[in-house]
């Protein structure tokens, strides 16, 4: 299998530490969400940013493959860190909310969103591991 891309991130100090990528494009302090100070990020925000970007890229590709012009897709991804009744450690859940223009019907928009979910590498990586709720809104 050919590798299309590889990146590295290094953390020191865990959830109360610092993380950077090998190219320093990301170079930030990390704090748990409960200790947010407005300057540091947290793993959940980093996951949400990556997943939202990846998913919107997949959604845009699916829309273009289906000849939807000027769709201007927008994806907002909500990540929750929540209690897991089956384990001592918490778990993640995700809501993916998309907005799209110039789609003929809500039914088409939902199909394209599901196709994006099937295609997105983040969705593939999390499938069966976390709860993911999909929602799409057709806007003018």
Swiss-Prot record:
Gene Ontology terms describing biological process: response to oxidative stress
Pfam families: OsmC
Domain of life: Bacteria
PANTHER family given in the database record: ORGANIC HYDROPEROXIDE RESISTANCE PROTEIN-LIKE
Family named by the database record: Belongs to the OsmC/Ohr family.
This protein's name: Organic hydroperoxide resistance protein-like 1
């Amino acid at each position: 299998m050919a590798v299309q891309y590889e990146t590295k991130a290094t953390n020191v100090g865990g959830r109360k530490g610092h993380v950077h990528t090998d190219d320093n494009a990301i170079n930030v302090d990390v704090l748990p969400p409960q200790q947010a100070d407005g300057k540091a990020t947290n793993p959940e925000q980093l996951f949400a940013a990556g997943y939202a970007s990846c998913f919107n890229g997949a959604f845009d590709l699916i829309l273009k493959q289906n000849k939807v012009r000027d769709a201007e897709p927008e994806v907002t991804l909500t990540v929750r860190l929540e209690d897991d009744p089956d384990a001592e450690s918490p778990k993640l859940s995700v809501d993916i909310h998309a907005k799209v223009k110039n789609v003929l019907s809500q039914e088409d928009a939902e199909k394209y969103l599901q196709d994006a979910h099937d295609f997105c590498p983040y969705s593939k990586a999390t499938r069966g591991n976390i709860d993911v709720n999909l929602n799409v809104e057709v806007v003018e």
